[in-house]
């Protein structure tokens, strides 16, 4: 049996033994000692989290319209069928990923799913479900697992790019499925943050980003820089041919790079959706 430690060392023991041991790890960055005591009673692999890390959760959704005759994309007219998230730190390191397909919508609302913007991807979703890449389950189970991850990692902040949309559609879906018995998808008291606001404050003041947008015509009708996740990722990665996949977890993995990039600049920026 093996035990994975936060410092990435691996310790092996004979199966069935009860082992109590103490590991003292010297922090290279802060020169502090971290003591971890582990009791091992069975053949399991245990990952020990570093409690000094301020873990964050980045989430993304894909949706279908409730009323397909409504012009425009509004969270109040959207149900969530794809939810992906990752537990990360501010440097963008990933500690856990999740990818779920909401069976209540994906299977229960097949007619509406055919009007989803990315309906052509439905066959690929089924392939991913069969291969285990995505998990098909109820919205209630998805929410339960989210709450468990938040508790396990001590998460106090949830991020999305254009969080106003994801926050809205998740709540609309939650209220419809529970008949408004439960009105909010996220736990009470969690800080709701938006990488779009961060990017506008950080990249919006960078001459290099402005020049990049002008050079590639990534501008609004009024001539202002655009701040879509796809365009920002093209800038920070140097991959100007990058195309966003527009599935939950795949988009999360580029949005966490935006989060990390903004933090690396050490600039004053807004994070919270409502501030």
Where do the model's predicted regions map?
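Basic polycationic patches enriched in arginine
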Residues: 2, 17, 41-43
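Short hydrophobic targeting helices and cationic amphipathic motifs
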Residues: 4, 8-9, 14, 22
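Acidic, Mg2+-coordinating catalytic module of metal-dependent nucleases/exonucleases
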Residues: 157-164, 168-169, 211-275
